[in-house]
Amino acid sequence: MNIIMVDHMKYQHNITSEIINNIPVIYIEGDLTSDADGDAKNVYSEVKEKYSPHKVIINFENTKYINSSGIATLIHIIQDVNERGGVIAFVGLTEHLKKVMNIVGISDFVQMYNSNNDAVKTV
């Protein structure tokens, strides 16, 4: 499991990953901002190098806040997965985060599920 925890004065985040049924799940806890950008990309890169996955799940159950830098990070990951012919799923989005994903158009490129189990069964 990859674990990166950062606690800045304004933003806090914890980005981890695990494998469920051979599918990497990346957990984004706290805030997905420019402070988390490098850590999110590093965890994704480690998962990519180790497992070369064609399916990736990103779990937002404990994500509190996302800004434009966080959106850019997600777009980077989505593009990379799509370029390799893969599928990406988002799990546990709040209604607010779903609305944000719809507004910026990300929801057109990912599958959305309520739980890891739902995503693992379908992806």
Predicted regions and their residues:
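N-terminal amphipathic/basic-hydrophobic helices that include classical n-h-c signal peptides
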Residues: 1-8
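STAS-typified acidic loop motif
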Residues: 9-42, 60
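Residues that form or immediately flank small-molecule/cofactor binding pockets and catalytic motifs
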Residues: 22, 95, 117
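Amphipathic alpha-helical interaction surfaces in cytosolic regulatory modules
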Residues: 32-110
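Residues at or immediately preceding the N-termini of alpha-helices
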Residues: 37, 116-117
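Short acidic-hydrophobic, aromatic-tinged amphipathic segments that line or gate anion-handling sites
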Residues: 111-115
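A charged, well-structured terminal subsegment
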Residues: 117-123
